[in-house]
Each structure stands twice: as C-alpha cells, then as structure tokens.
C-alpha cells in the first residue's frame, strides 16, 4: 500500500509512494514524517520548535499554554512562540531558559534546580540585580517563603521567590546569607558591623556567650560582635 497512514504498535507511519519525509502536507494538513516514515506526534520538531504535532493524529496544531516535548516542558504564548526567561502565569513565577549566547537555546522550562535568570550579567552593580531562584521539580513554579537545600547549601526564598541575601530574620532567627543566597553556617562573617559567628547547626547568630572555635576562644556580645579572649 502507498500514500496512507498505518498504525504499528504505538507508532503511526505514513507510507508514501515517493518516500517523502520531513515537512509534508496531506489533504491540507501539515505533518512531520521522520526516518522510516514514522509520523511525529506529541511534540515539536527535532529542533524543539513549533508547531506542535498532535498527540494522536500527528497533525500540526496551534497549541498554547504548557506543552511537553521530548520529556521537556515549554510554554506557548498566544502568538505561537515559546516563552523565554521569567514569566508570571496565573500568579506564579516560572523560568524558561534564555541564554542569548547559546544559538541552540530551546527555551525549555527549568524545574528542580537553582537558576539565576540573568546569569550572563558577569558583574552586576548589586547582588540584588542578579537574584537566585529555585524552581519546583514537579510544577516548575518558583518556591516562596521556604528553605531549600540545593547543591550542598541551604537557601531561603522570600515571598517574591528571590533568595534572601545578607542579614535576615527568618522565623525569629537572625541568619546570614552570602551574595548568592547561600546560608552561612559554622563560619564567621566580617563587615561594617564587625565580626560575627553563625551557629554550625541552626545558622543562627551567636550572641551573649563565650565559645571556643577552632581552638580560639571568643566572647560574642548582645549583637553578635566577636572579641578574642
């Protein structure tokens, strides 16, 4: 048989008399036929670019919203283009990769990892200009108002999804996070306020006590300033 669709197992094939593959139009409908005549279904093309090919028929369709293709998630805007960078959807913040230096960038959704959307800004004027976020592994939404342990460090993400930086009070505890949002635990911090120490377990600022750390004894006053004894 020639010039017809055939279902074999879970796959759909198009048998053509001239062996056509790639982008083809059949009865006014667009399809993508790969090697051996297999019809692409339930994804974008191999370059992860729209249009989207229907899950069942393989017909090119206009699709909007979240779309899964080759195991990765994307968001299609009303104009048919993929979302790029940070995007608020239904009150939640998402991030779609957007590296201007990568010509193969596909704008896939970031899930289950830390991300700095403006990572290509090598030397921002302020740490706050290049915030760190964590995007949930299941939904891809930026987590808010919670601690997250990622890449060997603790972070706390505020109500806007940004990792807290520097001196912060979280749940009544005085904590410190570096310029990337990593929580300081079991270490000293020195700045215009003096030298302070943050507990190795809780990360809380040590105050009003004497401690021996790495063989050296210090007294910490009411605001945490260390004085070597």
Segments from the language model and where they lie:
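Extracellular adhesion/carbohydrate-binding repeat motifs centered on closely spaced tryptophans
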Residues: 1-229
């Amino acid at each position: 048989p020639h010039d017809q669709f055939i279902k074999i197992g879970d796959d759909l094939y198009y048998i053509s008399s001239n062996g056509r593959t790639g982008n083809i139009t059949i009865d006014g409908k667009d399809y993508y036929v790969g090697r051996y005549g297999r019809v692409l279904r339930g994804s974008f093309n191999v370059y992860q670019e729209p249009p989207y090919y229907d899950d069942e028929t393989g017909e090119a369709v206009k699709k909007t919203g979240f779309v899964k293709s080759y195991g990765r998630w994307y968001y299609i805007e009303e104009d048919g283009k993929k979302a790029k960078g940070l995007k608020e959807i239904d009150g939640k913040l998402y991030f779609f990769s957007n590296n201007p230096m990568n010509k193969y960038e596909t704008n896939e959704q970031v899930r289950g990892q830390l991300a700095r959307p403006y990572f290509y800004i090598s030397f921002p004027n302020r740490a706050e200009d290049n915030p760190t976020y964590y995007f949930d592994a299941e939904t891809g939404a930026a987590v808010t108002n919670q601690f997250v342990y990622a890449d060997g460090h603790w972070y706390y993400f505020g109500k806007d999804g940004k990792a807290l930086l520097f001196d912060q009070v979280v749940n009544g505890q005085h904590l410190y996070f570096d310029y990337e949002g990593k929580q300081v635990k079991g270490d000293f911090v020195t700045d215009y306020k003096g030298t302070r120490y943050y507990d190795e377990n809780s990360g809380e600022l040590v105050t009003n006590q004497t401690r021996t750390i790495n063989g050296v004894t210090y007294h910490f006053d009411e605001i945490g300033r260390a004085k070597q004894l």
